[in-house]
């Protein structure tokens, strides 16, 4: 399978699984974002696509390509989300530590779950 097709499959899997988390956490995120920017969430879909391309490439390059264990996927996801969350907390006084912790853990779960699904159903 070509690398670009693999990354596209990874990206779609990540986005699909992440949708359920973001949807279930929408009230928390809506409140947080509105408190910080003074208006409701407004999505930039192009930026979102770029984000999932980067995440898909990272998961492929550092975990799936080398057939690393699920723990490596979990740690990579946690590190990526921890960097984002702690940077947000650094710049935004009202950024919640609750979101920092929840979203950091979710990053690990998302990457491990995506790796599991891809190996189980797509032979990665």
Can you describe what each PLM-predicted range is?
Residues 1-124:
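Juxtamembrane/disordered regions of integral membrane proteins
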């Amino acid at each position: 399978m070509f690398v670009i097709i693999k990354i596209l499959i990874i990206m779609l899997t990540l986005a699909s699984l992440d949708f359920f988390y973001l949807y279930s956490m929408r009230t928390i995120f809506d409140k947080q974002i509105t408190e910080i920017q003074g208006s409701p969430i407004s999505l930039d879909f192009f930026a979102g696509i770029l984000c999932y391309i980067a995440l898909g490439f990272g998961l492929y390059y550092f975990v799936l390509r080398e057939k690393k264990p699920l723990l490596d996927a979990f740690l990579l996801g946690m590190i990526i989300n921890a960097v984002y969350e702690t940077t947000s907390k650094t710049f935004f006084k009202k950024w919640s530590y609750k979101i920092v912790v929840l979203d950091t853990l979710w990053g690990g779960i998302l990457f491990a779950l995506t790796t599991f699904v891809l190996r189980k159903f797509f032979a990665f």
